[in-house]
Amino acid sequence: KCRLVIDFDFKYKEKLVNRQYDEDVIQKFITHIFSKISELYILSDEKKVCFVMEKGSFVDAPQKGYESKDGLHFLFPHIIAEKDTYKVLRKALLDLDIEKICKDAGFTPPSNDIEGIIDEAIYKGGNWFVYGGGKPTEQDKYKLTRIYKETNSGLMPLPIKLWIDNPLEIMKLNSVSNHSELSVDYTDKLQNGLKKKTLKQSISTESIDSMELNPHVLNKAMKYDIDI
């Protein structure tokens, strides 16, 4: 069991001059992800939070046949579930029409297909870099740039300064290390999509995060969410 992290890898056959997405595109991605999450997991409103991590810019692609690459990391810090369920979620996300979203916004869509864009390796024991880390060949690292909370009226941006000022807390949230308990329940649809039907009891996000995170940072962040 670990926190939900979704990795989008964009590869382009063209040599990019500008980044080929903006905040509106990111929000469309997140809205789609949350729609799939709601089909598979039962979670309270306060757990519907997404941290977005980006590099400062796109980079040259080392892969043959591509000129540029970019990416987005989506962290859902209050969703802790079994890794097998994330494979089901990833499969559900494959209907995301990234090409249309990008074209409608006036951007060049990635050249790799959706199977290649939504990385599955992290759910199969693949490597996942700690916050602020990255490949030794790349100087630019993924950093927290946005936080969104899903509400009945859509996505609401939350301030990131509290977390930026406490990078160690982001590192803890960004960990995909094993946890002993779940923080969500599974819908019938998800249970039917799993080969393994044995489910664990969920516990609240508050008790999980309180054990791991700095209480001062956690309490301030949760208070802000409630006030909003």
Task: Place the predicted regions along the sequence by residue.
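Long, low-complexity, charged/polar intrinsically disordered accessory regions
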Residues: G116, Y123-I228
